[in-house]
Each structure stands twice: as structure tokens, then as C-alpha cells.
Amino acid sequence: LQATAYICLVIATLCWGGNSVAGKLAVGHISPMMLTFLRWFLAVAFIAIISVPQLKKDWPVARKNLPLLLCYGAIGYTLFNAMLYSAVQYTTAINVAIEQAGIPMLIFLLNFFFFRTGISLAQCLGFGMTLMGVALTAAHGDLATLLQLQLNRGDGLMLIAIAAYSLYTIFLRWKPPVDWRTLMAFPALAAMLTSLPLLLWEIGRGAAQWPDQAGWSITFYTAIFPSLLAQILYIKGVEAIGANRAGLFINLVPVFGTLLSVVLIGERLQSFHMVALMLTLGGIAIAEKGRPKASAPTVPASPVD
């Protein structure tokens, strides 16, 4: 049973790690906002197939919490992915993959400032290391560029994406008591609706690009694998080995994203990438190890939906 759970969690994080690579491969084949809209349009169709009976059961509870569920989709699904797919137009998929490791750090900071969650010395050290790794990546190995406020446009957009997903995760503490299919379906529908104005804006600028054959392949990948399959496998993994242990597998997302960027795109893995990976993953590991037991999460949020 544990082996099956591990396989499910590895495949889930592999799918999520491939999202930034898919965004990079989409350049020249489909525009960012078009990809965001079509991804969630297709995802809604796929999710509806497995969710409609459950949605009817959960509707009384979901209706009372509709604004919150729609907020999940607008921030965690639309804004995150729109910024990510825009970011890879200007920076490497490796950078985008590594920078996502900053999400746990920002979640920690938001929890501390708004909810005064416990903090340990190990957590301070760990998240300091993670911050250094993300900063090193965003600065392309030259921290002096940050001091001069010369941040690459793509890395800047990715920082917005990280902030959006961190806020989404914080809001999950108020998630309604509904089935996981309902918790996927309504935010996905909200993502489809809120990504439409972004698509219209892109069309108005004359920057929209309808997908070609490769673009459609990428769109179907993002709609099926990161949006649906990864979510299902992650939930199965959590059910089998518990949320805390399953949450550790999320740290594989930047690793898989980096490896896939090298193998599939042929991006060059530079020395600062290696240092940044060691800093971010090492920092997360130290922070997790030093987490006060009382503040351990019961349900870690699935990343990079």
C-alpha cells in the first residue's frame, strides 16, 4: 500500500513539475492567456465527467461558500498559471521550476504574520536558505542585479505567481466541508470564467495566438495531467500515508521541473541553478524538520495546480 502511495505521489509531482516545461514548449505555438483559458475550459469538461453526481450532493454547502470557492479558482488557478505561462516567455523553465520552491516559505511567512503560527530557529534558518536560493535564481546567479532592481521580467512575473498561490493556500484553511471533486470543480469553473477577460485583453492587444497542433497537445497535457490526474493521485497518496508525509513529496516539483527542462527543452543547467536547488530544498528540509509539532499542517495544499 505504501509503495503504491509513493508511486502516486511521484507521478503527481512529475505532472506538476512538467507544467513549467509545458509553458515553455508552448512559446510560439499558443499564447499564454489562450493556454490558460483553454486549459481550464477542457479541465472543467473532464472534471464534470467525474464530479456531477457529487456536485449535486454538495450543492447546499457549496452554494453557501460559493464566493470562497470562486476565489480559489481566480487566485490559485487563473492568476498563478497566467503569470507562470507569461513568465516562461522571458525566462527559463529551470528558473520557473526552482522559484516555485519559494511557495512554502511565503506560506510560512503569511501564516506567521496573519495567524501568529509558531516559529522555531530551524524554520528561520531553513526559510532563509530557501529565500537565498530563490533570490539567486531570480538574479541569474548575480545577486547584485537585485540590489540594482534589475529583475528579469519573467522572474518578476513568477514572483507574482508565487504570491498568488501562497494566498490561495492560506485561504484553504477556510475550505468548506465538501468532497474533493467539488473542491476541484468549482474553482476550475471559476478559473475558466476569470481567465476569459485575460484572453480578451490578449486578443485586444493583438497578441493572442490560436494553438497549432503542438499547441493543442500542450493544452491537453496541462488540462489532463497537472489539472486532473496529479490532483487525484495526490489525494490518493494523502489517504494512504497521511498528509504530513505526502506533503514532503511536493519538494520534488522543482527537481522534476529542472530535470525535464534539461531533458525535454535542452536548457542549460548552470552552476547557480545547482547551488539554488541545494539551498531551496535543503532549506525546506530543515524547516520541515524543525517545525513545531503543534503547527504541523493537517492537509498540505497540492502545488502548482
Pin down the residues of each PLM region.
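Specific alpha-helical transmembrane segments that line the substrate/conduction pathway
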Residues: 34-45, 81-123, 161, 243-263
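Hydrophobic alpha-helical transmembrane segments of multi-pass integral membrane proteins
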Residues: 3-8, 34-50, 71, 122-135, ...
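Specific transmembrane alpha-helical segments of multi-pass solute transporters/efflux pumps
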Residues: 15, 19-20, 48-100, 136, ...
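Hydrophobic/small/kink-forming positions within alpha-helical transmembrane segments
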Residues: 17, 21, 73-78, 82, ...
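Glycine-/small-residue-enriched transmembrane alpha-helix faces in small-molecule transporters
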Residues: 1-34, 145-174, 193, 260, ...
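Helix-helix packing/entry segments at the starts of transmembrane helices
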Residues: 36-38, 94-102, 170-193, 223-263
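Hydrophobic transmembrane alpha-helices of multi-pass small-molecule transport proteins
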Residues: 47, 119-141, 195, 251, ...
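Membrane-interface helix termini and inter-helical loops of multi-pass transporters
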Residues: 21-29, 86-89, 138-151, 200-218, ...
